[in-house]
Amino acid sequence: DLDKITTAIVAEALVQSPSFAVTWAVQTGIGSLPIIWFGTDEQKNKYLPKVSSGEFVCAYGLTEPSSGSDATQAKTSAKLTEDKKHYILNGEKVFITNGGIADVFVVFAQVDGNKFSAFILEKGTEGFSIGREENKLGMKGSSTAQLIFQDAKVPAENLLYKVGKGATIAFNCLNIGRFKLGCSCLGGSKQAITTASQYALDRKAFGSSISKFDAIQKKIAEMAILTFATDSMIYRTIGLLQDEIDLIDKDTPDYYIQMGEAMGKYAIETSMVKVFGSDCSHWVIDQGLQVLAGYGYLEEYSLAPAYRDDRINQIWEGTNEINRQIITGFMMKKALTEELPFRDAIRNIDSFLNEGPSSDNSEFGKEFDSVETAKKLGLYLFNES
């Protein structure tokens, strides 16, 4: 097994081919992780060898026409037959990456109307069909299609984990998906900086390279600063997560379930990575395109397709607006349960506000004080709200 740090590096590098990166991310992430983490031995033995070899392509069916980020309100239904041998699925999924090319689908549905659950479906299942390919703004090399269930007949043994445990599966897998998305965005930001910097060095105006103009230097410097912050956030987070995973006994029967649950402990951080990383790449690519000026608007130059491809990153894996709510919601929940030591930190706010930071003359002392002050002010506002 690759460690999670290597996964982050690979996700960052694959942005050189964005549409393939999306296909790969689903194949190695949300499309297969539900089976890896929560599948039975029989399910793993049946599907994972062909998934890992590439013989089977995976897809993940969560979003519906009337439920996006509020996924647990899905309308797709699953009813167990009287002989208890099959579940009958009815409903529709939309915006499904790899939908038109997949062989194996992890699909979520309501059992008995309110028990959100996950199932493994195979291409060709009776009553299961694939809708048309969507005509998208970007990521044109990837497949995005509808999934349609009309009395789709799914073997009962294809239920994943337990009835009613769909949210556990969906959101633990989305946590790693959000993180990997942030890594891809980091790669896109770095690529935009490289493209803009090289163009600025080569482009001449008013008798000199435009890289000597203050306005261009400021743009590239700010692009680099924001990208560096994203890089630091990503690799700090994945280091913490890897440390958590390393504590799990690999010989325990529920090793992968524990790994999935470990991701849940970092739901705040993975949402932060997703939001900050995608906001960063959106801004950095936009600024890079501005450096290229008119040439940046031409499809034959790399930043025009990058601009289109990047736009989806603020939407999928939960919109950035929803992820901001997730961040705040989990912080409040962990504060109330004292999983995060907010109460102890709040008690120290008054003395900090009265006395200020305890500065020293060490390297980065002032910078450290600035960060600590920002933390305390954020905590103060969080408590007052």
Feature annotation, model-predicted:
Residues 85-130:
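A short core secondary-structure module
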Residues 1-45, 49-54, 97-104, 227, ...:
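Internal helix-loop-helix
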Residues 248-250, 282-307:
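A glycine-biased, small/acidic residue-tolerant capping/turn segment at secondary-structure junctions
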Residues 67-68, 94-100, 176, 312-317:
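Glycine-rich phosphate/pyrophosphate-binding beta-alpha loops
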Residues 129-231, 271, 312-385:
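Glycine-rich beta->alpha junctions and the first turn(s) of the following alpha-helix
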Residues 54-62:
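A short, Trp-centered hydrophobic/proline-enriched beta-strand micro-motif
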Residues 228-276, 289-290:
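C-terminal helix-coil-helix/basic helical segment that borders enzyme active sites and/or dimer interfaces
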